[in-house]
Amino acid sequence: ISSAASDVYKRQGESEYLQAVKEVLLSIQDIYNQHPEFEKASLIERLVEPDRIFTFKVPWVDDKGKVQVNLGYRVQFNNAIGPYKGGIRFHASVNLSILKFLGFEQTFKNALTTLPMGGGKGGSDFSPRGKSDAEIMRFCQAFMLELWRHVGPDMDVPAGDIGVGGREVGYMFGMYKKLTREFTGTFTGKGLEFGGSLIRPEATGFGGLYFVNQMLKNKGIDIKGKTVAVSGFGNVAWGAVTKATELGAKVVTISGPDGYVYDPDGISGDKIDYMLELRASGNDIVAPYAEKYPNAKFVAGRRPWEVKVDIALPCATQNELNGEDACNLIKNSVLCIGEISNMGCTPEAIDAFIENKMLYAPGKAVNAGGVATSGLEMSQNAMHMSWSAKEVDDKLHQIMYGIHEQCVKYGTEPDGYINYVKGANIAGFMKVAHAMMAQGIV
């Protein structure tokens, strides 16, 4: 695998993408080298390159009548096991490196769910923050004027991501329907009134807690009464806080770009609902939480990983937990780290966790609940059915249990330590690899 990897590592300017590729290649090198047929078929060289990338301009008119221009992207990474599947991100930081990394990760994450979904990702450097509802609608419609020709229920099924919630998905789906004159399950994360699935908004957080709970159970540890640090305060964090509280844990932090809130009384009940109000305000800050709940403390400009807790759950964005943060958590005797955000931990943090034999699981395993429930939405759309919240939640729980079992199967080392990074990467890789081999050189 080293010769194939060296060509990838020489690339410049795609740091996020290279970070994701390196992590996977290091995990799979032993099992890859046991399969000479993979090398003969140049499997790695084919796997690390997207099938295709679409880049396009998105001109739209703001409320002042001025034309604005943003860049739009769709990365169709791999469809060996099903239609391309992955979210759309609207954020000023969006670039091709980030979307390639997300599409690459999505390929293996989707494989872990056992549902027939390939990997893809898309987005734009457009930021919804500070924009009016009318401006967001016009941008979404302009974005779809190009994207519609590249997506479809059996070709490529987008969903939401950072900056893209139910409102944006609704606007994009409406424009897609207008252009194609078809009502199909081309998007997931839709409103319940037009084909959406129950549990979808909270699914990533719910699934993350199901996985973390299984990690703890596997070690004979009960999650009840454990303290939890959560970063972020959007849908993912909200789902994680809700399910952690339901399982009997006590969440004591949330965070935003302005800093973090520490609430020693625990974030539960109406405080969880207030998280949604904070997000809906559009201000992207968590400081008002401490004003509303005086027992809570707001710490400006810092991350929550300095708080002594039993469980740490990054739920915000990539590389939000670094090596220094990891050392703080280890020093404070954290029991478990579940990376619910995509690539939430830096390589230095991951190395520290694994070197210290910590219970640590990567995003492609822990946060697969979101795309798993998207897959369940696709199934409901295809069958023209709607399942109850309990049916969806039960299926989600079953899928997350199955992902955990795959990680244990492939990640258990001779000394008994479970390397969840290795386990998740090998399990996802083997499924995609066998599918690619069976379909020939295409």
Annotate the PLM regions.
Residues H91, N110-K224:
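Glycine/serine-rich phosphate-binding loop and adjoining beta1-alpha1 elements at the start
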Residues I1-A5, Y9:
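Single conserved hydrophobic/aromatic residue that forms the stacking wall/gate
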Residues A382-G440:
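Mobile late-domain/C-terminal helix-loop "cap" segments
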Residues A316-H384:
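Rossmann-fold NAD(P)-binding glycine/threonine-rich loop
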Residues E37-K66:
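Structured beta-strand/loop patches that form or line metal/cofactor-binding pockets in enzymes
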Residues G191, G196-E306:
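Glycine-rich phosphate/diphosphate-binding loop of Rossmann-like nucleotide-binding domains
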